């Protein structure tokens, strides 16, 4: 196993923390805007709430998958040492 020097490991950890924070921030904003739009749509047209709900859940799943991809990439950077 090849070891990283402490400064490279620290920078990798810092980069992963910043990357995950930005991914969580973006996903949170996206989910909030999607929920806001769905609530406004249901308030305007209550009869279409079923279709709006299905589209909302599908959209939220796609948004959440971005955070999961960011987590996987961060775990690869932390534990697989791709820089060596």
Swiss-Prot record:
Record site feature (Reversibly protonated during proton transport), residues: 64
Stretches that traverse the bilayer: 9-29, 57-77
Bilayer topology: Multi-pass membrane protein
PROSITE patterns: ATPASE_C
GO cellular component: plasma membrane; proton-transporting ATP synthase complex; proton-transporting two-sector ATPase complex, proton-transporting domain
Subcellular location: Cell membrane
Keywords from the UniProt entry: ATP synthesis, Cell membrane, CF(0), Hydrogen ion transport, Ion transport, Lipid-binding, Membrane, Transmembrane, Transmembrane helix, Transport
Record-linked SUPFAM superfamilies: F1F0 ATP synthase subunit C
Domain of life: Bacteria
Single annotated GO MF: lipid binding
Family of the protein in this entry: Belongs to the ATPase C chain family.
UniProt function note: F(1)F(0) ATP synthase produces ATP from ADP in the presence of a proton or sodium gradient. F-type ATPases consist of two structural domains, F(1) containing the extramembraneous catalytic core and F(0) containing the membrane proton channel, linked together by a central stalk and a peripheral stalk. During catalysis, ATP synthesis in the catalytic domain of F(1) is coupled via a rotary mechanism of the central stalk subunits to proton translocation.
Subunit-level organization: F-type ATPases have 2 components, F(1) - the catalytic core - and F(0) - the membrane proton channel. F(1) has five subunits: alpha(3), beta(3), gamma(1), delta(1), epsilon(1). F(0) has three main subunits: a(1), b(2) and c(10-14). The alpha and beta chains form an alternating ring which encloses part of the gamma chain. F(1) is attached to F(0) by a central stalk formed by the gamma and epsilon chains, while a peripheral stalk is formed by the delta and b chains.
Name assigned to this protein: ATP synthase subunit c
Taxon lineage: Bacteria, Pseudomonadati, Thermodesulfobacteriota, Desulfovibrionia, Desulfovibrionales
């Amino acid at each position: 196993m090849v070891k990283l020097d402490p400064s490279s490991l620290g920078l990798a950890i810092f980069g992963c923390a910043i990357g995950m924070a930005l991914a969580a921030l973006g996903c949170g904003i996206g989910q909030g805007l999607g929920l806001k739009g769905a609530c406004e749509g249901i308030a305007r047209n209550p009869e279409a709430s079923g279709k709006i709900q299905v589209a909302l859940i599908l959209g939220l799943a796609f948004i959440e998958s971005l955070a999961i991809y960011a987590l996987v990439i961060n775990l690869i950077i932390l534990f697989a040492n791709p820089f060596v």
